[in-house]
Amino acid sequence: STMFLTPNHKYILYNKLHLVPFAEYIPLSGQFPSLNNLNFGQGNFSHGTEYTVFKWKNTKFSNLICYESSIPKIVRKFIQNGANLITIQTNDGWLGKSAGPYQHYDIAKIRAIENRVPVIRSANTGISGLILANGISINEQPVGKTAVFTVSVPIGEAGSFYSQYGDVF
């Protein structure tokens, strides 16, 4: 889950919509309860149902949690609900020393381009940075580097043909 704490000390909660199979839940365990006896070291979480859009001054943003950035329809729905910025918090530690953290970052670039929306990505062990709506990376921090940085985010009119019509081809 993600919590957005407002200046007047109220909070808004977003619960992850798309859980990672075999890591955060066991698929079909509702239909076949004996699957719950499998132990892969997984969690047994419940997914959220709300496409939450947070508001801060003139910016409306939605947050993706880790694996959700690989699901195009989730970002599309956030944009349709009014988000003009996407943030991603992710744990890329499970990818180890592989191409995974780079691929995961590139997936975030694709989400920015296909929805014409800036993306801010914060990774605990992967690549962090700002991705502009055209896919160009700004202040990209490499895998394994600890960093804190401030960056100006150009907020424009989010949305594209894909945001409006989806997978029509």
Regions found by a protein language model. Give the residues of each.
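Enzyme catalytic cores with a strong preference for nitrogen-chemistry domains
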Residues: 1-169
